[in-house]
Amino acid sequence: MIRFFAFVLFFATQELILCNNLPCDASDIAYEEITTQAGTQTNTFCDCQTETYKFSTGTSTDKQTTTVKYKCKKIRACVYAQKCGSLDVKPEENVLSTFCTCADGQVCHDTPEYADETRTFGDTKYHSFVCT
């Protein structure tokens, strides 16, 4: 009976951990992707306020399972006239990137009409932004 309750408690705790959607701390793993022959499963542990980066990749000894863990990028404060972000407008997608955080009272816009600089290469437009 004790084992049954221990199992139920363990399962419930895991579900709470995977569904909490709390903001990530700097050292937290945000999510992991586990790929097997059956497909890919994603376990989300917390929500990043920034973009993520691949932190580690592990492969099981039998080469049947690969686990990739992701953390949140650390965004530093912007210095004077530094590019705070960019928007790459491509035919198939738009990619918004953040490079640093603006000081209180300033904002890093994310629409082309507020771009500090715009360049076109092929069928892609690159817009960059500074804090205003």
Swiss-Prot record:
Tissue specificity as recorded in UniProt: Expressed by the venom gland.
Entry GO terms, CC: extracellular region
Family that this chain belongs to: Belongs to the scoloptoxin-11 family.
Chief localization: secreted
Domain of life: Eukaryota
Descriptive protein name: U-scoloptoxin(11)-Sa1a
Post-translational modification: Contains 5 disulfide bonds.
Keywords: Disulfide bond, Secreted, Signal, Toxin
